[in-house]
Amino acid sequence: MLCFRNITGLAIYPEICYNICVCIIMELSSVQNHLKEVIAMSTNSYESPFCTRYASKEMQYIFSADKKFTTWRKLWVALARAEMKLGLPVTQEQVDELEANVNNIDYDMAAAEEKIVRHDVMAHVHTYGKCCPKADGIIHLGATSCYVGDNTDIIIMRDAMNVVKRKLVKVIDQLANFADKYKGLPCLAYTHLQPAQLTTVGKRATLWCNELLMDLEDLDFQLSRLKLLGSKGTTGTQASFMELFEGDTDKIKELERMIAEEMGFDAVVPVSGQTYSRKVDFAVCQVMAAIAQSAMKFGNDIRLLQSFKEIEEPFEKTQIGSSAMAYKRNPMRDERICSLARYVMCDVLNPAFTAGTQWFERTLDDSANKRISVAEAFLGVDAILNIMLNVTDPDNGLVVYDKIITRRVMAELPFMATENIMMDAVKKGGNRQQLHEKIRQYSMQAGARVKQEGLDNNLCELILADPDFMITKEEMDAIMKPVNFIGRCSQQVDEFIENCVKPVIEANGVSDDVAEINV
């Protein structure tokens, strides 16, 4: 038999080499086929755009199968540990085995089991028991499906709210910095989308920021009142635990306290049916909808300002605005904010109807809807905040065109200044009613000149030429300074940041989150 030597000096025989090569080729072929299946699954079946385009990996994980089912197992561990400490026939060895296998989930086995038993919780009980043979007999002892299902949902919502809070605080901080930077830059203020008076770019930003602060306050409130379901049994009576603990009420209450503490909660709900009240889902999703409202207001304002060429969202060097019109710079980020916000605002109707249709101690018509609506409320808001983090970034975010802003201010300022001009003339002895009528007539003339002839606003020239106003060019120039018409804008911004924003930032800190935008 021929014998060769490889670079390590070991003898390799042709027959063995051949068999090894065949095995490697077969394995590679299997991997290739599996990859083809994965690719096919990603292109010939529906995938949520929240996962493929919009939401962060962090938020996607929170609503993933791994997060859900490992939390189920952690709850089973907490239940077993508490039952052991309270004297039930559960051993430390069994608890240790359960704890060691929290992440050892055979999803194929669980799926096969669910096809047989048509019950997701029991499928996972059996799957967990297979890898924990010593603890198999005590898994889920005294519990009902909602012990793992509902408690996990509460834990997931808590974790998701904390992610939302962290990003929301950073957006608030970035908007406050923007407001401070531009607190003294006069711009047109609008009512009915018509120029009204002046405000400043920074003062307007405080309006966006303040609404987000209101949302943060609501979010903190919902976080503070969030409680675990606990271990209430099939209809909320804890009858199974009364049997297990032979009527010892104190032990049953201690069981819940221990479980809540292990899962990071201060308390469980005082009373329930089989489930926690679905009003909790509605209250939480209502906060998500409120954040979406605030974001939509911000996004719409930026879209309008971009159409005026006053402020633009960031536009990348290689970004294409239109497939036909190469010159376009569309506000696609803010348009996406508004689009996603609309979805989240409508989504809140789902938990509202779900809460209203929970018959007696529970029905199952909440389940399918809840799996979709609660997750998508968070995924949607996460996507919105990611975009807002990008758009409000202090280095590469909103672009302010101060010269355009000033030019548009000066085009309208003559109309806005007429009251001050009239007051000065009255102080010099003029007739208020006659001057008011003259200003009305001159304003109509100047307006027609602008709209019908496309010429500049000449209202100031018309007033200067009328001796009844008794005003000089120097006096007119002094009146026509935009800063004279912004009231307390700068002070309001300073006070808002000092009294409203700074306490929030000091209490929460600012994360180092970087906007995660895929497209």
Which residue ranges define each predicted feature?
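A short, charged helix-loop
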Residues: 258-273
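Short amphipathic alpha-helical segments with heptad-repeat character
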Residues: 66, 158-169, 176, 202, ...
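Glycine-rich anion/phosphate-binding loop at the beta-strand->alpha-helix junction
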Residues: 215, 274-367, 371-372
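A helix-coil-helix interface module used to build multimeric assemblies
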Residues: 35-239, 245-260, 321-322, 332-336, ...
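Short beta-alpha connecting loops at secondary-structure transitions
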Residues: 60-64, 109-111, 319-339, 361-376, ...
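C-terminal hydrophobic structural anchor segments
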Residues: 419-470
